[in-house]
């Protein structure tokens, strides 16, 4: 395969290896050599593509955000009503790709290290804003703007909390149960509220 075609493949392999390595260790205290070994490439090649561990970690976070955004956009395009849009947003956050054990562990590790890294904190804020705005867009068609913001805030907190619960392992809700819990929360919050469509 020509070198120009190999670079995106190698970059993706290293990012996938970073997710696995961070997830397995539950820490960003990993080395480029460990990630490269997991990817089956040399540390020199990893440094060549990313220029160091910090840039590789940030590239991994950006990749996770892009994947989530891509999956979310595809799901939302299939939604025809506000309720379908809300269901799509929730389902994507608990899809097999997003709710995988190593991916969850990587996300939680990023949250911990956001306290020391402005770059990681900025990317996590981007994620939170996107989730919130997507939920509000659908919810404000069903209730007031203020109420939509409050429900979206609660739903976002539930999603984050369910990721933490799942990372704990035993007795944690599976994806289907997690989806049902968030959907039930939103339905209860909307019940009895005057619809914006009326």
From Swiss-Prot:
Keywords: DNA-binding, Repressor, Transcription, Transcription regulation. Residues 8-68 form the HTH tetR-type domain. The keyword ATP-binding does not apply. The keyword DNA-binding applies. Residues 31-50 bind DNA. GO terms for molecular function: DNA-binding transcription factor activity; transcription cis-regulatory region binding. Repressor involved in the biosynthesis of the osmoprotectant glycine betaine. It represses transcription of the choline transporter BetT and the genes of BetAB involved in the synthesis of glycine betaine. HAMAP family: HTH_type_BetI. This is HTH-type transcriptional regulator BetI. It comes from Brucella canis (strain ATCC 23365 / NCTC 10854 / RM-666).
């Amino acid at each position: 395969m020509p070198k120009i075609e190999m670079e995106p493949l190698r970059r993706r392999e290293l990012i996938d290896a970073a997710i696995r390595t961070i997830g397995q260790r539950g820490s960003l205290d990993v080395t480029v050599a460990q990630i490269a070994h997991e990817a089956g490439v040399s540390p020199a090649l990893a440094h060549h593509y990313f220029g160091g561990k910090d840039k590789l970690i940030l590239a991994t976070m950006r990749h996770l955000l892009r994947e989530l955004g891509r999956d979310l956009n595809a799901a939302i395009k299939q939604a025809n009503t506000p309720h379908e849009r809300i269901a799509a947003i929730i389902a994507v956050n608990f899809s097999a790709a997003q709710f995988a054990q190593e991916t969850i562990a990587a996300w939680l590790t990023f949250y911990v290290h956001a306290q020391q890294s402005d770059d990681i904190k900025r990317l996590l804020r981007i994620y939170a804003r996107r989730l919130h705005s997507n939920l509000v867009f659908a919810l404000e068609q069903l209730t007031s703007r203020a109420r939509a913001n409050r429900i979206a805030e609660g739903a976002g907190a539930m999603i984050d909390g369910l990721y933490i619960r799942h990372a704990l392992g035993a007795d944690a809700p599976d994806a289907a149960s997690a989806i049902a819990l968030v959907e039930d929360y939103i339905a209860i919050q909307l019940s009895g509220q005057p619809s914006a469509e009326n």
